[in-house]
Regions:
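N-terminal and secondary-structure boundary signal
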Residues: 1-286
Length: 286
């Protein structure tokens, strides 16, 4: 089985069509190689990033832990995303995340700092309130929040989460990853966590969601506690639809997408498709 239950496999695999798939699900190669093949299947990064544009890449860099613990996005995925953006003609590629633990150490210990430098990206600090601006948005619950200025000042957003269990929301994937773009995350908890996560898409919807499912924390997330919490899935989900990316990824953790509040609410608000049977999905084994 590649990511989806048997009943969803017929009728959604890419057939003889000229249009790129809605979602690509990959397994069996290194994280960087999977992204290279997946973005090719989607029509190339030039479909999402135009020459001269500036890009914000948002991975998970929240935890002061090494790559092997699965708490942060695999650095090879981040590096390859940035390289493809640069090759598509991006003027600059910025990387942001409001880290939960010490940001300097999290950046370097995760390997993402080295990946950014190797690929020509620019890391922008997120640890001080002066980097954020308050904006109003048309959310059901979240109507105002402080957003990282990099997100507001640049053209394209790409969310690059690592798939994980989360004790508060069930899962953390592409949509919830964007909580790392705001200053006061406690505000979400005060006014309604799942609705606020979905509402944030009114600020800026990512053009691409790249879900790293190489090492996956399946319990005690989002940080994990030991190597026993991590399962090697050696997989990746890529889609221009963040709801579809989250729906497919949630099923990898044996969760029904409609049972995850923020995924369902984002779908109901029109930000993407939660019903995978309606999508053209290409599965690639490498």
């Amino acid at each position: 089985m590649l990511f989806l239950p048997q009943g969803l496999r017929s009728g959604v695999v890419q057939a003889l069509v000229s249009e790129p798939p809605d979602l690509v699900a990959l397994r069996g190669a290194s994280p960087g190689a999977m992204f290279d093949r997946g973005i090719e299947a989607l029509g190339g990064m030039g479909r999402f990033v135009k020459p001269g544009q500036t890009v914000v890449v948002k991975p998970n860099i929240s935890f002061d832990l090494p790559e092997e613990m699965g708490a942060n996005t695999n650095p090879a995925v981040v590096e390859h995303v940035i390289r493809h953006c640069m090759n598509a003609g991006a003027r600059r590629v910025y990387v942001i995340d409001h880290a939960i633990e010490r940001w300097e150490s999290s950046l370097e210990r995760s390997g993402i700092g080295a990946a950014i430098r190797a690929s020509g990206g620019i890391h922008v600090p997120s640890n001080e309130e002066r980097f954020y601006r308050r904006v109003s948005l048309n959310g059901a619950t979240l109507t105002s929040t402080q957003v990282h200025e990099a997100l507001l000042e640049n053209d394209v957003l790409i969310t690059v989460p690592v798939l994980k269990h989360h004790g508060g929301t069930g899962v953390t994937i592409a949509i919830k990853n964007l909580m790392g773009c705001v200053w006061d995350r406690r505000e979400y908890h005060r006014i309604g966590l799942h609705q606020s996560i979905a509402d944030f898409l009114h600020v800026k919807k990512p053009v691409l969601s790249v879900v790293d499912a190489h090492r996956v924390i399946t319990r005690h997330g989002p940080r994990g506690g030991s190597p026993d919490d991590v399962v090697m899935m050696n997989s990746q989900i890529i889609s221009p639809d963040p709801v579809a990316a989250d729906a497919a990824s949630a099923m990898m953790l044996n969760r029904e997408p409609s049972d995850i509040g923020h995924i369902r609410l984002a779908s109901e608000a029109g930000f993407g498709e939660i019903d995978l049977t309606k999508l053209n999905i290409e599965r690639i084994s490498l």
